[in-house]
Amino acid sequence: MLTTRHPPHPVQGKKGKGKKGKKGPKDPTADKSIDFLYRQLVSDGIIQKVDHVQMKDYVGSFGHLGATFDKKAAEEMATRPWVPEPSPAQVRAMVTEFCVLPLGSQGVKDHAPLNTYINKKGNRAPKNGTPVLLCGSPGTGKKMLVHAVAHETGANLFNLTPSNTEGKYPGKKAYDMVHTALKVAKALPPSVVWIDDAETVFASGKKKGGGGEPPNRILKHLIACLEPKKGAALLEPEDRVLVLGTSAEPYLCEKAKDFSAFTGFFAKVLYCPLPNYPSRSMLWTAMLEKAGVERPNPDEVQTLARISEFYSAGSICKVVSKTLSTRRVERLARKPFSINELIGPLAKEEPVYATIEQEIQDWHLKTLNLGGGGDGDGGGGGKKKEGGKKKGGKKKK
């Protein structure tokens, strides 16, 4: 069902022919072929190999006792806004709906654009590149979901993460990097453009990374190619190109203008929570069976699920892979597996502290209060500024 469709003749060189009025962004590689640019991006590490993972590998259950927990949590948080967190199964369904289906099917992309929603002002226009943000604590499967989306759709993976582009295309050449990546992504659909640590791209300031370049150096070039103030954008909503951002610390965009730019850039913001109890049970069982343990004891699995609360799915997978090494699996027939072998390695893993998880949840609630996509003028940022000016004037008097 999910097939790759290549355009018969990638457009190069001249821009705007056949279209009246708007002119596209400057093309610094107009004299180079798509094949040459593709090889160049591969050699520079921008186009990367996709891991062999599928959406079903994001193991998790629905919240079967959600109504009970929701009622209890609502009573505890009566003084503040509260929205129940999604279960891993719901996250898997949302990523499939918003990312996999539109990217894998041109028919879905053309006739059922899922990057639109209804807000107070009416229908919001589709965004170029259909940007989607996955936010959640470290180890909650954001990177795996990126590779799963690319693998399920047979897409090319372009990595524009600041840490991956350090030392590459310095200075003014950053525009060439962004434009070339989006140009090749459009010419060879389906394509996924991945930006990890997305909060650093939208945080203002001149804080430099390890390579001497600020992480936000690609922001203005992304805006110039996707949402230009004048002229046509490089990508259109109909293109099977997905800009997928991931963030473990989205709350670092503290300033009102940074928050507005961050949430306003993405059409969808999806929260990846820590696994709940039934999801931890499923994950322990799946990982033990994958490692070579036949029919894990259900009572022992329930114990593991209880003691692994506040641990991420990544930590659970890491513990199983460390404990059940190839040599240990070969000795399972002579020395049966015991749950005690996992408790020590699990204790050495760093749990996700409640304060960190709460910060991410609060940030996600803030995006929902802005209408789910962070309209720049839909939240409290502008009102605070106006109020601040008035209060400041009174103090001066």
Segments predicted by a language model, with ranges:
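Ser/Thr-centered, proline-biased regulatory motifs
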Residues: K15-K20, G380-K397
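Conserved AAA+ ATPase small/helical "lid" subdomain
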Residues: E238-L242, V269-L270, L274-N276, S281, ...
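Low-complexity, interaction-prone regions
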Residues: V11-K22, P237-V243, G373-G379
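Extended, charged/polar low-complexity intrinsically disordered regions
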Residues: M1-C99, L103-G104
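Surface-exposed beta-strand-to-loop junctions
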Residues: D35-L41, V53-A78, L157-S163, T200, ...
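Eukaryote-specific, cytoplasm-facing alpha-helical/coiled-coil scaffolding segments in long proteins
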Residues: L133-K142, F310, K348, L368-G374
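Polar/charged alpha-helical tracts
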Residues: R39, S43, G60, E75, ...
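Walker A/P-loop NTP-binding motif of AAA+ ATPase domains
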Residues: W82, P86-Q302, G380, K397
